[in-house]
Amino acid sequence: MDDVDDDSTHCEASPLLPSNDNDASRWPIRSRWTELSLISRYSLPLVATYLLQYSFSVITTSAAGHLGQDDLAAAAIGVTTMNICGLAFFEGMATALDTLCAQAYGAGNKLGVGLHVQRMLLLMALATIPVGALWLSSPALLSLVLKQENLAVKAGSFLRVSLIGLPGYASFEAGKRFLQSQGDFDTGMLILVVCAPVNALLAWLFAFCLGMGLEGAALGAALANDLRPVLLLLCIAFKRSSHQCWPGLSCRAFRGWGPMVRLSAAGSAVTLAEWAAFEVLTFSTSYLSTMHLGAQTILTTTSVVMWHIPFSFSVGVSTRIGHLIGAGLVSAARRVAVLYSMLFVGIGLMDAIVLFSLRNYIPYVYSADPEIRDLVSRTMLSVACFQVFDAAICGCNGVLRGLARTSFAAWVVFFVNYLGAVPLAMWLELGPAGMGLDGVWTGLGTGLVVIACTEVTYMISIDWRRCVDNVKYREE
């Protein structure tokens, strides 16, 4: 295909770059800028969406920090457990829709988009049962792994209250993919623009005005989570253009779960392996002191806030690659993947510079304890360097999701993290090296370098045309 201008008459699956394999050298600069413009239109609303979504945890942690040191530590443990034993699964499951819905839309099977979403909602409903049982039992379970009994009780109570918002969290993750696969990345953002202030208001009201403490902050976040899918459903009902992808409630939603389950399992494994690495190390800092636990909570929260920027771009990349692969445009997909690799390195460097520049100011957002603030400031350089490699991993995983090759990423992340990075981080933190929190981030960063090199090598070696054939087989 020849060079294509930014023409509104082209659909979202149209290539903006020459798709002929023989035209690789004839890639005009304006096509590169047009592609970057498109991915920015996809991703910038997603950055706002995910940052606003993550603000729910930040607001809860911040409220806990102003309640007291024990409340901050309990919130850290509660959020950690909530992420590992719940949210990571649902977040990972939803990434399967980044693949399935985008490829179905690109292949012209628009009704398949809604069918994939229906299947995912059913799967998430089933997954809520064991997750809910685990959260209800959390006070007793946490007391088995924590030395401080009072922290186990506080964190367990936090999780029980948070369970109220779990169905809303899960269904919103699936529902917003229905619109994103059609190129609508704004609606989810606008919903969170409404819900984030509601969360802050409810957390302040319940925690401080009504004297409910940490449980009040958790309740505010839970109710705001349940509001999100309600507003999303209303938006879809009034957005008639999205109805072209809705087949109506269908018995077919109970069949053909194979691809979705496989991609959901792989997506959950990737997310869980990444998140759990942080959370295991957060637990390990409790063996240093409560102060170190509070500082690590702030550092992890800040790092994850920054991570949402490259992750948001990676979701946009998944959608774009999925559209191109679904439409059979292999050459264009390969070239934009190269372009995106440079983009993610730039994002990582930007994140690192921002964190290091603000290292003496960020701690004041979370804590009034001067010792915690000083420890956070001294460790921020390691966290800043970590961002460069974390952004590169987001880019790799975004391309792999678009190709429906998430399972490879799952294996790589799991083995590298738990056979190398996490043990190294714990040895540097607690072992003879005595690096403390700097050791945590150095160990994890070393693992990211290995993961990035492995995934890039894999993407270069695989047959992208076979990915197209798999889409045709599934969607036809």
Q: What are the functions of these language-model segments?
A:
Residues V47, L51-A73, L142-E149, L205-M212, ...:
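Helix-terminus/linker motif at the lipid-water interface of multi-pass membrane proteins
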Residues D2-L46, C101-G168, C195-L202, A207-A265, ...:
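Short alpha-helical transmembrane segments in multi-pass integral membrane proteins
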Residues Q69-T80, A155, L159, A218, ...:
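Small-residue hotspots at the loop-to-helix junctions and early N-terminal turns
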Residues V399-L400, S407, W411-Y418, L428-G431, ...:
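C-terminal structured "cap/appendage" subdomains that terminate the fold
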